[in-house]
Amino acid sequence: MIGYDDAAHVADAVRSALAQGPAVREVIAVDDCSTDGSGALLDGLAARESRLTVVHRAANSGGCGTPRNDGIDRAAARYVMFLDSDDVLPPGAVDALLGAAVAHDAQVAAGLCVRRELPSGHEVPWQPELYAKASVVARPTRRPRLVHDTLCVNKLYRTDFLREHGIRFPDGRFVYEDFVFTARVLAAAPRMALVPDTVYVWHVRRAAEKLSISLDRAGIDNWQARLDAHRQAVEILLAASCKRLARAARAHFLDHSLRMYARELDLRGAEYRTDWWKRTRAYLETFDTADFEAAPAPGRVVGRVILAAAEPRDLPRLKEVAARPARLCPPYAYAPDGTPAWSADLPQVTLDHLLHRPMDLLPVAVDGELRPRARGTRLRLLLHELYGRVADAGPRTVDVDLVDRQHGTTVQHRTAAFTALPDDLWTATVALDLSALGRPGTWDVRLRLHFADGSHRDATAHAVRRPGLLRRVAVPSRRHGVLLAQPYATHSGALALRTAPGVRGVATVVRRRAARLLH
């Protein structure tokens, strides 16, 4: 377990490891020269728990890699795991991993990690497809998708395997050190046992005064660190002749990292965007055609636009393509030979894959206008044609779900029929009952489009930005008398809704608005 200036959480992390039971021979807590009393707190715990050993570093290492290496050096048990001071191990995690490793004589055992949003407690599984069922992988090249899970903390490693292959973390100030460590593990071709059990809880504190590395993406240094770590990981795999894994890693970069940062580009300043674009182009130029072809279409398109354009462009449209699910908003251009293309002036970025892509994967664009009103709330949807595919499928109906983002539950469900309009457009309108929402919250608008040919597409609506649309409106509430509702656009441009029930909620928003005006 490693920690630095995390006195508020370190005891919970240590206790979660000790609570795993007799399978845990020793917990080695490496304090990276904390200044907030974390070291003394750990010493106090160690005085009462013989299985806890505390290592005090004399100088701060600047990263997570060096203290983890210290732990590897001190480990005397046959197996080792890693834990961060602000996370926890759920009950039974070690037993699940250790049991699989022993039963299958595996050098590495891995299980499911969940990202737990705090304070809401909402959990999102990390790479759940890998851990849907128990399995044994004789060598990683037989399952290239393993490169998608770059985490080091949801795995148990045989200590002699790490030492025999000299597998360590990058030392010093090296962000995304787990990218490199995981590549070194996979390059050593371990026998791996995968379990469906949840073995790690990754705490996500978006409101924290100091953001974690994975959340602190505002500066260009974070993106450069990610590029450097990914480049080094790919080089490690290629040096070990793991070409399939290297290709899968590059394809995953396009689908995950590139899409994630592209969704946030229009939140940054002009200088950041220009710098980001230049650095990203330089890295993507090291990819070959097969790397792009191996990636899912949205990331492939985003990457090709960046390569084709010397300067940042079309950021709002790129953001929508990078969304999950992807949305390709107008205009819909063609190359001179009639091939669908990103734009008339970038005909080399072809979109011909859209002509044969299954409807359930087609990045259809649906504009959404949510209008909260005292006499009833209406959601108007406008479905766009996409190179003839939508008309051929025949839009019929749309299911609209209002989903509680905190708990992932559907609180309202509506269905409406599409009506054809001129210019290859279809519209549908549903009524939503906002008065039934009984607490402050954030609500996602999710759609399922049904077509005459029997196909369907799950989608989100593009939040239309026009005067009077994305603003706060007070509407009646059966529970609280009044409800403050605000439709808004998420980072990816999708339509969502925030609510603040009751007079107190309205007053809070009014005070915040007044404070902003005064400052």
How would you label these PLM feature ranges?
Residues L245-R259:
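Amphipathic alpha-helical protein-interaction segments enriched in hydrophobic
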Residues L267-H519:
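Basic, ligand-binding patches in group-transfer machinery
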Residues D255-R263, G303-A308:
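Short, hydrophobic/amphipathic alpha-helical patches that form generic packing surfaces
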Residues A17, G21, A46, H230-L237, ...:
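Hydrophobic, Leu/Ile/Phe/Ala-enriched alpha-helical segments that form helix-helix packing faces
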Residues A7, R263-L267:
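Short acidic, S/G/P-rich loop/turn micro-motifs used as interaction or catalytic elements
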Residues M1-Q224:
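Nucleotide-sugar donor-binding/catalytic module of glycosyltransferases
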Residues T182, H230, R250-L254:
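Short runs of predominantly hydrophobic/aromatic residues within well-ordered alpha helices
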Residues D197-R205, L211-R244, S257, L267-F287:
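Catalytic core of nucleotide-sugar-dependent glycosyltransferases
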